[in-house]
């Protein structure tokens, strides 16, 4: 009789352990979904890798995970956590689409602060992440093109250009950015899109100068390509290097160097032709 009771207790204990293990695995999987979702949002939209790692780490810890380890580069995110039983789980997420939307980065940071304040469960956080993933771009292509023209126009003031240079740079900045967006959509290779856009800007600058529009062609071209200059990439690369994230820092700076090279080649090609 006692033997049967012991066997029954053992079965009950093993069943309880199995249920607890399945429950912990489900919870940990949800937490990893939240961590990888927030990290991917930040990486895709231009956040620095050290900021991504810090945010993902804090999210995992605030959800009760132990032994949290996060590693990110501009195109990948690796997260390892331990549940309360010591079981390790790892999630690898590949980032293929890189763009610049600091508004999404800010909203992802706000989401992580809500998690730190214990305002969101993993399911609620996943719903918020899904909303951010489906969010439409803040500005339309037409608005971006007009903004690019204004930015380039006012750069002529910084470079001590004339009012005629301001008008020419505004026109070329808008046209050049439109060429960049169109070629990026067709070719889907950023390097060639920037090369084509800078070539178009330099060629049109020569044409406008031939028509008597603008005074200093150097200031016009320099101002018109400013929206193509990888300022954010250079800043992020230097900040990653300063934070000892050497792999991501060097890769981001290499991308910025390629972009600068594409702009230079596009402009130099026009001057070599004329």
Model-derived features with residue positions:
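Core alpha-helical transmembrane segments of integral membrane proteins
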Residues: 137-211
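Soluble N-terminal domains of membrane-associated systems
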Residues: 9-120
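Alpha-helical transmembrane segments and immediately membrane-proximal extracytoplasmic
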Residues: 88-100, 138-139, 143-145, 252, ...
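Cytosolic juxtamembrane amphipathic/interface segments immediately preceding
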Residues: 128-137, 247
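Intrinsic disorder
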Residues: 3-4
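Short, flexible active-site-proximal loops enriched in glycine and acidic residues
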Residues: 116-125, 139-145
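Generic detector of multi-pass transmembrane helix bundles and their immediately adjacent loops
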Residues: 210-274
């Amino acid at each position: 009789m006692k033997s049967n009771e012991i066997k029954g207790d053992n079965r009950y204990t093993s069943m309880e352990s199995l249920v607890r293990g399945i429950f912990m695995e489900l919870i940990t999987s949800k937490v990893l979904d939240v961590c990888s979702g927030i990290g991917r949002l930040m990486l895709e939209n231009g956040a620095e890798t050290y900021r991504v790692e810090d945010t993902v780490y804090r999210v995992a810890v605030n959800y009760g995970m132990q032994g949290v380890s996060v590693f990110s580069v501009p195109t990948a995110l690796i997260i390892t956590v331990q549940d309360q039983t010591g079981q390790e789980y790892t999630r690898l997420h590949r980032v293929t689409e890189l763009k610049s939307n600091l508004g999404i980065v800010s909203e992802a940071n706000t989401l992580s602060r809500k998690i730190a304040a214990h305002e969101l469960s993993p399911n609620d956080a996943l719903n918020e992440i899904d909303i951010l993933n489906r969010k439409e771009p803040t500005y339309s292509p037409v608005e971006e093109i007009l903004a690019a023209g204004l930015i380039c126009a006012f750069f002529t003031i910084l470079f001590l250009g004339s009012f005629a240079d301001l008008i020419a740079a505004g026109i070329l900045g808008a046209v050049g950015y439109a060429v960049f967006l169109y070629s990026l959509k067709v070719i889907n290779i950023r390097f060639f899109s920037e090369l084509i856009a800078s070539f178009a800007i330099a060629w049109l600058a020569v044409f406008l100068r031939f028509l008597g529009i603008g005074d200093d062609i150097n200031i016009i071209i320099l101002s018109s390509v400013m929206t193509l200059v990888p300022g954010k990439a250079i800043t992020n690369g230097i900040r990653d290097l300063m934070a000892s994230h050497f792999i991501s820092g060097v890769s981001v700076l290499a991308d910025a160097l390629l972009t600068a090279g594409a702009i230079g080649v596009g402009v130099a090609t026009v001057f070599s032709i004329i």
